[in-house]
């Protein structure tokens, strides 16, 4: 197999540029055009024959547009005789659709996985899937990265002697516990029940947060309804400080503004798995780059080295 070729869709070209800068390779151009009937056409503007092709495209708003674009990129690479096609998908939005929790409901996580493989993907590189079991939906290898090292390196600048990592729900408690171990902190979790996409109820917080420096950790923040509900429960216990952290800062429907307006929230930390428009930035927002981690994973995949070893090493910081 020949050298690496990295292409980016239109979802997050800045991240693809960062990854290529870390790898020391150029970002190959992609042409996306739209016909009068609203159909898309994608052309990869560099040779792919027998090359190790990496396609960078998080599934962010507009999700369906970016998904079709990614499928066409896979198809174009396969048609151009690529040696291997790895989809670098820092955010897989359909990971939320991972179970049949209502009659006659679609299972988007599995369907989109099948579509990517059918389009030509030979491997997937993902970051902090909303439901980790989703990687089992793929019939090709999936390398599942997380951003805990990057987040931990950021929070180590503070005094963590009274820190407690709080998961908004028990489903994310395992990741919160791992993060707490990295920081030498305590861990707590909210008792959450979801009624709709933007309607949640957190009845209590399980764990010690009174007088503590709280770091709320979630995999993603979309509308922010869960975090706002959790903040109400935390205030009842009287934490000393509150900071928010997530991997995917989606911040839909003005969520970033609402969270930044909370006077007791000192900081909102996310990574650049998804683009946050500059006009939405606030003084409390901190965006950490996961480009070095993605680039190292790409390098290891290309060279046939272990990707899981990235997490066996001592955490960053």
From Swiss-Prot:
It holds the Pfam family Pribosyl_synth. It catalyses: D-ribose 5-phosphate + ATP = 5-phospho-alpha-D-ribose 1-diphosphate + AMP + H(+). Residues 211-224 are annotated as: Binding of phosphoribosylpyrophosphate. Keywords: ATP-binding, Kinase, Nucleotide biosynthesis, Nucleotide-binding, Transferase. GO terms for cellular component: cytoplasm; ribose phosphate diphosphokinase complex. The keyword Isomerase does not apply. One of its GO terms (biological process) is purine nucleotide biosynthetic process. GO terms for molecular function: ATP binding; kinase activity; magnesium ion binding; ribose phosphate diphosphokinase activity. The keyword ATP-binding applies. SUPFAM superfamilies: PRTase-like (SSF53271). Its EC number is 2.7.6.1. Belongs to the ribose-phosphate pyrophosphokinase family. NCBIfam families: PRK01259.1, ribP_PPkin. This is Putative ribose-phosphate pyrophosphokinase. It comes from Streptomyces coelicolor (strain ATCC BAA-471 / A3(2) / M145).
